[in-house]
Regions:
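Nucleotide 5′-phosphate-binding alpha/beta core
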Residues: 1-124, 438-488, 494-520, 524-526, ...
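Short hydrophobic beta-strand segments
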Residues: 124-127, 151, 278, 383-387, ...
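Rossmann-like NAD(P) dinucleotide-binding subdomain of oxidoreductase/dehydrogenase enzymes
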Residues: 104-262
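Nucleotide donor/acceptor-binding cores
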Residues: 122, 526-527, 603, 680
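Active-site glycine/GP-rich loop and adjacent strand/helix microenvironment
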Residues: 1-26, 30-33, 38, 197-457, ...
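Conserved S/T- and glycine-rich ATP-binding loop of Class I adenylate-forming
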Residues: 124, 489-492, 529, 580, ...
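AMP-binding/adenylate-forming
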Residues: 503-519, 528-588
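Hydrophobic alpha-helical segments that mediate membrane insertion or helix-helix packing
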Residues: 40, 142-146, 371, 489-490
Length: 836
């Protein structure tokens, strides 16, 4: 019978030894390949969906769990397992424990040149406790999150739950590679040949159990192997003196302690076994009596399991001894006389005492000054303190407990509860399953932000999903409740819309954009950057680049897009800024007007928000001697950063940010991939956006793939931007919308003739010319006045002193430019020349 799930296949016990002998070859081939991280997250999230519904896999896993666990506990554990598998939960765990959302990627330690990363240890053998199915699933997921090869070792008595769980992840993995990282075997720890073969390939052994079991693992582990021990722990309640006399605090402490004693029948390491009362014996006895009364009310309402014969025998023995010692004045027993479900034992001797569990609690008096002396001898076994106290005692008591060896302090009544990303037994599990690595590359690597730029590992796009249009995306964004961060769109839709982000997603994307800025030529260790992007009105450019520059730890001068060129020039000279970032239509007039003062000062310009024309580029490089003029980032409020330039990217050519995005280029008319070199619509899928989800989003830009390898050495694919689709276009800063011009003329002047937009260059200035047809009882002046009054972006460009002009022209109807194929009037004609 097949009993082991061995890297995607079920095998019989007679095959296991042979497979163990072949492990070294498997390790060599798997560990050198990039881990399928995104596919793992998606597979886990799909399994979470299935476990949240009445599905066949949920029924199968529940049936297997019921072989060793009571139904209520099995259902609760399965529910907790499903919650753990959520993509959002796993990313939060990574961020909490490792500080990154994607381990295994060496990133620059800005402003320095070295790279660091959390990297998998390699092969992790998980030696799991018997009959605790959820622990095996948790251990497997934690190992996968870091990118390890995982072999879960269970006892022969365990069910096939963990193996079926692993198989379920594999069947939901679209990459087909996740199976190479998972095996679940059921074998006896007494089989030394197998255990030695298994441990010989382990880079780390994560072992659960008592002292004897952990010692056996350490003795069998190869020299230098990391042994991660998850041993038995002991926990307790503590009631501070101020909770004894205040009726409200006392009631809360009693309720909390009673719940802690009953929940899970004290089977968790975080369940209390002793309750300390701060004070003398009289206070302890009074609290014990009240606790017994409170248990009589609370215990019947909390379902539990009955002890087996051996466990009941231990309880009986402890009670018999306590009853005998009562005559000596050492103890007093308060017991459930009806159902025998709980018991409180007042013990007048000091010290933390283990309980026989199943709702059995010792109560002891203690003085605050004796906390450390009493508890520290047990420091290696201490875990949780369920603390009932007022605010005035919190700091002092917390310091005492933590000094004694406690690793976790909770509110009374919540000892077995936890939160996402919480440490376990004083450590983060993921740091135990990972290693911190560093790389100091050759001088050529100083322009590289992440090593993945040299690997070019773009994930496949989910082509079975329909393409997401702008209106649908905006509906998703509007549906997001309580977004952490909101930006106003630049206006490409012609309406006020918002883009929403979680803080985690935002910072991930800004860090990636920072890597792109370094690729473009920014030197975080030496440059000083003046941020001249527009701020206010909920626009994202200034604040986003503030965050980008902060992530690079580069010197920043946060000036903003102010109109006072003299002040900007003065601050450039005072601060020694040698790099400017902002809109071309703002930067070019600044250098035109102050060329003498700024001569030789500005070495680099990184632009964004609009196109850089050939004339502007030539002016900056030839007349102003700026040595580097490149795109700061290709991005949008909707999809975030999407592309970056390197020194070999000319014009609108960008490398794709594969850490964040996947890209498809589809036909202009049909949703099919374009032929090689053809221009099509850009379709982005974000790999780093939880809400709103960005899947196959038509961003509104057109472009084409650039074949071949880039001379910079990066393998991130390249694409060239060609223009915009639909009614939106950029000119002199903000987005403008053709349809909005038409609607304003219709509503304000009842103009019904044709409208055509022409965007031109006049030296370094952008001219937006709006053509209306002659003979419609309308003047150019009236039309321009209405549009300036009603279209705020026109005034923003004027107020910001951008190199931008707007004018309305009345022209003969026959002069309007038309689409050759259809004869239709072309809405937008862009006559600008871009950078060569």
């Amino acid at each position: 019978m097949d009993r082991h799930f061995w890297f995607g296949k079920w095998i019989g016990d007679d095959q296991l030894s042979e497979r163990l002998d072949a492990l070294p070859g498997l390790m060599d081939s798997v560990l050198t390949a990039p881990f399928p991280f995104d596919s793992m997250l998606e597979a886990a999230d799909k399994l979470a969906d299935d476990l949240a519904q009445d599905t066949a896999i949920k029924k199968l896993l529940l049936d297997k769990a019921l072989e060793t666990t009571a139904r209520q506990d099995a259902e609760q554990m399965l529910e907790a397992t499903a919650a753990m598998l959520r993509k959002e939960a796993m990313l939060q765990k990574l961020r909490s424990e490792l500080g990154v959302s994607h381990p295994g990627i060496p990133c620059r330690r800005y402003p320095h040149r070295q790279f660091e990363a959390w990297y998998p240890v390699g092969c992790v053998v998980h030696v799991m406790p018997s009959n605790v199915f959820a622990v095996a699933a948790l251990g497997l997921i934690e190992g996968l999150l870091v990118g390890n090869i995982n072999i879960v070792k269970l006892s022969v008595r365990d069910s096939t739950f963990a193996a079926l769980f692993a198989e379920s992840l594999c069947t939901r993995d679209i990459s087909g590679r996740l199976q190479n990282y998972m095996a679940v075997i059921r074998t006896s720890s007494a089989d030394q040949n197998r255990m030695q073969a298994l441990f010989a390939q382990a880079d780390a052994i994560s072992a659960w159990g008592g002292e004897r079991a952990i010692s056996a693992v350490r003795a069998s582990a190869a020299e230098g192997t990391r042994v991660i021990a998850w041993g038995h722990k002991i926990s307790f309640n503590y009631v501070a003196a101020e909770c004894l006399d205040d009726a409200e605090l006392r009631n809360k402490a009693l309720d909390g302690a009673a719940k802690d004693v009953c929940r899970l029948d004290q089977q968790a390491c975080s369940s209390p076994q002793t309750l300390f009362v701060e004070g003398g014996q009289a206070e302890a006895e009074s609290f014990a009596r009240d606790l017994a009364e409170r248990l009589g009310h609370i215990s019947p309402g909390i379902p539990g399991q009955l002890p087996d014969e051996a466990e009941q025998a231990e309880i009986t023995t402890v009670l018999n001894v306590a009853n005998a010692e009562e005559s000596l004045g050492l103890t007093r027993v308060f017991e459930d006389k009806h159902s025998k479900r709980w018991r409180v034992i007042l013990d007048k001797r000091p010290g933390l005492k283990p309980s026989p569990l199943f709702r059995t609690i010792f109560v002891k008096a203690i003085q605050r000054q004796n906390i450390v002396k009493t508890l520290r001898p047990m420091r290696t076994w201490l875990q949780t303190c369920g603390l009932a106290c007022g605010l005035k005692s919190l700091a002092e008591l917390s310091r005492a407990f933590l000094s004694a060896g406690v690793t976790r302090i909770t509110r009374a009544g919540e000892m077995v509860d936890s939160y996402l990303g919480a440490p376990h037994d004083g450590v983060y599990a993921l740091t135990q399953l990972a290693r911190r690595v560093s790389i100091d590359g050759p001088p050529a690597a100083e322009g590289i932000g992440t090593i993945t730029q040299l690997e070019g590992c773009m994930e496949s796009a989910p082509t079975e999903t329909p393409i997401l249009k702008k209106k649908e995306f905006q509906a998703r964004a509007t549906a997001v409740k309580q977004a952490h961060l909101m930006f106003q769109s630049g206006g490409s839709s012609g309406q006020t819309v918002f883009s929403t982000f979680s803080w985690d997603d935002y910072h991930d994307q800004m860090r990636a954009a920072g890597h792109g800025l370094v690729a473009a030529g920014l030197d975080p260790a030496r440059d000083c950057v003046m941020n001249l992007f527009f701020s206010g009105h909920m626009y994202g450019s200034f604040i986003s680049f503030w965050s980008i520059l902060e992530s690079l730890r580069v010197r920043q001068v946060p000036m903003g897009m102010i109109q006072d060129q003299a002040e900007i020039t003065d601050k450039i000279l005072l601060t020694g800024s040698n790099v400017l970032i902002g809109l071309p239509s703002h930067l070019v007039p600044l250098l035109e007007s102050n060329r003498t003062q700024l001569a030789g000062r500005i070495k680099k310009i990184f632009y964004g928000g609009e196109r850089m024309t050939r004339a502007q580029y030539r002016f900056l490089t030839e007349s102003c001697n700026v040595s580097v003029v490149r795109s700061a980032v290709y991005g949008s409020n909707d999809a975030g950063p999407m592309g970056y330039q390197c020194p070999y990217c000319k014009g609108t050519v960008h490398h794709l940010m594969t850490d964040l995005q996947t890209l498809e280029i589809v036909d202009m008319e049909e949703d099919i991939p374009v032929s090689e070199g053809e221009v099509g619509r850009l379709i982005f899928t974000s790999r780093a956006r939880q809400y709103p989800e960005v899947t196959r989003y038509e961003i509104g830009d057109t472009g084409r793939w650039i074949g071949g390898k880039c001379a910079c050495g990066r393998l991130d694919p390249r694409f060239e931007l060609s223009g915009r689709t639909g009614d939106a276009f950029k000119a002199g800063g903000p987005f403008f919308n053709y349809r909005k011009f038409v609607n304003l003329l219709d509503e304000g002047l009842e103009y019904t003739g044709p409208v055509q937009v022409h965007v031109r260059e006049e030296g370094n200035t952008i001219l937006l010319e709006l053509w209306l047809a002659e003979g419609h009882a309308i003047t150019a002046e009236a039309a321009e006045r209405v549009l300036r009054e009603q279209y705020a972006e026109l005034e923003i460009s004027k107020e910001a002193a951008l190199a931008f002009k707007f004018q309305v022209c009345l022209v003969p109807f026959e002069r309007f430019k038309r689409v050759t194929a259809s004869g239709k009037i072309k809405p937008v004609c862009d006559h600008r020349t871009e950078i060569a």
